[in-house]
Amino acid sequence: MADIIIKNGYVLTMDPEVDDIPNGVVVIEGGKIVEVAETTSATANTVIDAQGGVVMPGFVNTHTHAGMTLFRGYADDLPLAQWLQEHIWPAEAELTASDVLAGTRLACLEMIKSGTIAFADMYFFMEEVGKAVEECGLRAALSYGMIELWDDEKGTNELKKGREFVKEWNGKAEGRISVMYGPHAPNTCSKEFLSKVKEQAIADNVKIHIHVLETEAELNQMKEQYGMCSVNMLDTIDFFGPGVLAAHCIWLSDGDMDILADNNVNIAHNPVSNMKLASGVAPVMKLLDKGANVCLGTDGCASNNNLDMFDEMKTAALLQKVDTMDPTALPAKQVLEMATVNGAKALDINSGVLRKDYNADVIIIDMNKAHLSPLFDVPSQLVYSATGNDVRTTIVNGVVLMDERKVLCMNEQQVINDAKQAASDLVSRVDAKN
């Protein structure tokens, strides 16, 4: 007997080898998908009627800072330097482990409710992030954010912390948690330190998560410091490869794009954050045309201000259309692939499509709503009309985390209350020092 059968829904497989099934079934057993078909003879302990819904792979958020939910709306509409120096950095200096735990629990709740099944996170107090992921049932690729600032002693300590986190948490939560090394960025970490990180990642057989060319200021700093941009500098130390997840990648030359594509680097595009901070527009269409694996991330709530991948998909599609002045750029199905297939590839998880033997990481979206009617084209409707609030059910590793909008793995109101209190206390501590 199977664990779960999902029936009567429009099955959007995201599988290039299998057509969508307008009225199909998905059968789940032992945390895996065992059948995707029009009908089934299987029986199950749980039967979910997806009538009026779309059954599809859950989303993969490939770049965020989950604990920063506590900073949602804290300092908006400010120049980047002022935003960081006068608000975010002083607040982060007061963060405690319990703050990050409360903020991450809130982030996990928000992601479950909006259909995200896995996320890549870089922040501090990462053990607390691991605890939150372990509790809630999501998948995550976690990295301790290492900032060395050309200080050898600091770099040694940062790499030690990163290694300890890798050893303690990689593979935890029944394999739902993987750990990556997280050197923050080329403009906060020296070339020598980044080279050491690459060597350590190879030795430990783990991936790397890094910010690359998020701002024009980084581009200018790298040219002044090294006589070349971040991508070229990283290429000189053989930093790149399929085990690298590079966030942002905005200020790229054509040569930079070739380097990233040729080295199979995974690129996390964060359009909402990039627009909000006026960082620039990533050349997504050029990167995709060169064969790069471009996926989607939300960045942290301080610069987004939510973790809704529907929001990210629509923004990504619209931004590329206006940037290229081509309404056919980044069509709905392609941006859906970025949010599912490409993201799963970047995090090396066997998810992102509805296919036999793949992880049972499945969401159901309620399409029987005014803003989703009439329904002519499912991918188009999901990208341009749907929101995270339309997700009805979220399943990860064959476990139902949310059913009919009710979260089963967390006390929703308690999580919200705890995060509100943590944010209030944090701001009070910051204000007391000013």
From Swiss-Prot:
This enzyme's EC code(s): 3.5.4.41, 3.5.4.31, 3.5.4.4, 3.5.4.28
Residues bound to Zn(2+): H63, H65, H211, D299
Cofactor note: Binds 1 zinc ion per subunit.
Associated pathway: Amino-acid biosynthesis; S-adenosyl-L-methionine biosynthesis
Co-factor(s): Zn(2+)
Database matches in SUPFAM superfamilies: Composite domain of metallo-dependent hydrolases (SSF51338), Metallo-dependent hydrolases (SSF51556)
Binding site for substrate: E92, H184, E214, D299
Keyword flag Metal-binding: yes
Signal peptide span: none
Keyword Zinc annotated: yes
Catalytic activity: 5'-deoxyadenosine + H2O + H(+) = 5'-deoxyinosine + NH4(+); S-adenosyl-L-homocysteine + H2O + H(+) = S-inosyl-L-homocysteine + NH4(+); S-methyl-5'-thioadenosine + H2O + H(+) = S-methyl-5'-thioinosine + NH4(+); adenosine + H2O + H(+) = inosine + NH4(+)
GO biological process: S-adenosylmethionine biosynthetic process
Any one GO molecular-function label of the UniProt entry: S-adenosylhomocysteine deaminase activity
Superkingdom per UniProt: Archaea
NCBIfam families reported in the protein's UniProt record: PRK06038.1
Function: Catalyzes the deamination of three SAM-derived enzymatic products, namely 5'-deoxyadenosine, S-adenosyl-L-homocysteine, and 5'-methylthioadenosine, to produce the inosine analogs. Can also deaminate adenosine. The preferred substrate for this enzyme is 5'-deoxyadenosine, but all these substrates are efficiently deaminated. Likely functions in a S-adenosyl-L-methionine (SAM) recycling pathway from S-adenosyl-L-homocysteine (SAH) produced from SAM-dependent methylation reactions.
Protein's name in the database: 5'-deoxyadenosine deaminase
Species this chain originates from: Methanococcoides burtonii (strain DSM 6242 / NBRC 107633 / OCM 468 / ACE-M)
